Amino acid sequence: MKRFAAVSLAALMLLTVFASAASAADVIEIRGPVYNGSDINDIIDTYGENNALTIDATKFAAFYYDIDDNVTTETLSILAVPGTEGNVIGEGGIVYETTIQQVDYEFYRPAAGWSNYSLIGFFAEKYIPINPDKADKLAKLVLDSDDKYTIRTGEQLDLGEGYSIEAKQVDVDGEKVWLEFTKDGEFVDDEIISVVSGSDNTWEVELDDIQDEDDVVVLRVHVNQVFQGAVDSIAQIEGLWLIDYTNAMKIESDDEFGNLDNVKINGDTLTITNEDTFTLTRDDEEEIAEGLFFKTADDTRALRFYAMKQITEPGTYEIRGEVAEGDFSWDATNFAGFFYDVNDDVSTESLTVTGLNGGNVIPEGGLVYETTIQMVDYEYSKPSVGWDQFPVLGFFAEEYIPINADKADKLAKLVLDSDDKYTIRTGEQLDLGEGYAIEAKQVDVDGEKVWLEFTKDGEFVDDEIISVVSGSDNTWEVELDDIQDEDDVVVLRVHVNQVFQGAVDSIAQIEGIWLIDYANAMKIESDDEFGDLDNVKINGATLTITNEDTFTLTRDDEVEIGQGMFFKVADTAASDLRYYPFVEKTIDGEVVDDDEDDDNVTEPVDNDTEVEEPTEEPTEGPTEEPTEGPTTEEPTEEPTEADGTTPGFGVVLGLVGLLAVVYLVRRNN
């Protein structure tokens, strides 16, 4: 009996150790249009045409799109084929198709040979066809940049994915530079580039045997200037283009991509369909292929779903709305940045442009942002114990909670709404994000109650003893006063699932957490300004903000609307207009640098006026460093005193406990 108890305790401790060590990664979801109907055929009839529902890049922000050239390559279609009924898509009813297109280099200089190149979107990633007319051999695009980078001789310019170029030497006349191209530190090619008048200043690296293709251009470098000084020898690069040729792939007709397994290649077009039926399972995410999913609502009365792509890599990402060419209106169904609850079919925000009249100037009052408080279910949805619904308000693409459920003037950001299970020992803290934490102080000897403490930035806020005996709701609500002059404001809800008092460990299991950032709550006044939106009206549960002055959609520019929301406007002729709204979302974390141990690696710097030590790493398009974003965090079950170099308290305690159990078992033998 003693051995059984000891082994059982060991198993529980081991489970707890691993539960404490686990934490959910941040995820950005880029969704397509929301489709809602009685069944799949009703949705195709309502939103599609000719028995087909088709999504392209103008509607689905994950697909590749060049707004300046209005170029898309990918489409995802649902067809009304035999077997398509209810929530089932028949065989061959999902069609993913992508076609090679020509796009301009970011460094656009046709006279110098930098005009356009072949590109194909492949499951929402940018690829380059090895053969510009065939879609079967592809390499990912690593870099397409028109930034200026300055490097000294002996320094390397990190291009990403292990590729780099080094300025070996500059000639004494300052007219030529010797560049070397490497992959993972290994030599690939080198060239002496002249910058004298009449030369195109461009180095093209051509390699053979890339997926059995020869003379494949894998790198293009345009050298702008060369400088030979008394101290420094410097090359200035403007124009970089690179493909990941070492990981090029060949697509075969018998390849499978998730649930898409019927591959057809017809010249520059790649088509992939499903050989088996595909079920849109309610309250689930079903992978289509290669990180693309259909997300379906938990609603038995209707069929509601959207296509989406999940991103987990650290970085900053643009989430855009549907592309417009004149007056337009966006809500959560066509702008993925806006808050949307698919299960409850709840959205709160809209953005409307009127009065363009063929031009690019929005008149006074023609730009209207509006948001209205709505009720949504808790993630931990248990109405019988008081976890039913709460009020929410999207505010410039972020999720906020109104301090007063009926007024949209006082808001606090939603930090956490989770139904995950978290196990903490006494003395340990559960980090809730934004400096908030709860700690299990003690468990009573009968294992029926736990004493929890709530803190902000390490300072005491409140505490409570929660009972888990039959008949109690096991929920702790923290109510605070004077939150933007409001009293009895619920700022935290915690549901305790179980309490365990063992010989070694005292443990509380939490399932159900809801938290608002009350410390940074804000009040919106009628004279507030949000970017170019400066006419604020609050009418009960609805907040409306418009522009008092005219608003110009400047071509080839990003124009801020307000609070980090922008319009991106295409570089078109004066007679045309093309634009979309977007926000940026960030996943925190460090990007692994393969060359971080090299002391002589130079990261690029964008520098037009003077020579400086390069510090900027090139990326496709604008350089974006990951920053601490305002996104909702999942709790990480780590003691706050643990750091990245030493084991957490939970792990050490678990190991000590296991050794003790082994000792007890051996002694009992």
Curated annotation (Swiss-Prot):
Post-translational modification: Glycosylated.
Annotated signal sequence range: 1-24
Pfam families documented for this protein: PGF-CTERM, S-layer
Domain of life the protein comes from: Archaea
Sequence ranges of Acidic residues compositional bias: 590-627
GO cellular component labels: extracellular region; plasma membrane; S-layer
GO biological process: cell wall organization
Keywords on record: Cell membrane, Cell wall, Cell wall biogenesis/degradation, Glycoprotein, Membrane, S-layer, Secreted, Signal, Transmembrane, Transmembrane helix
Main location: secreted
UniProt-listed InterPro entries: PGF_CTERM (IPR026371), S_layer-rel_Mac (IPR006457)
Disordered: annotated segments: 588-648
UniProt subcellular location: Secreted, Cell wall, S-layer; Cell membrane
List of glycosylated residues: N36, N70, N116, N600, N607
The keyword Membrane belongs to this UniProt entry's keyword annotation: yes
Keyword Zinc: no
Biological role stated in the UniProt entry: S-layer protein. The S-layer is a paracrystalline mono-layered assembly of proteins which coat the surface of the cell.
Family designation: Belongs to the Methanosarcinales S-layer protein family.
Protein name: Major S-layer protein
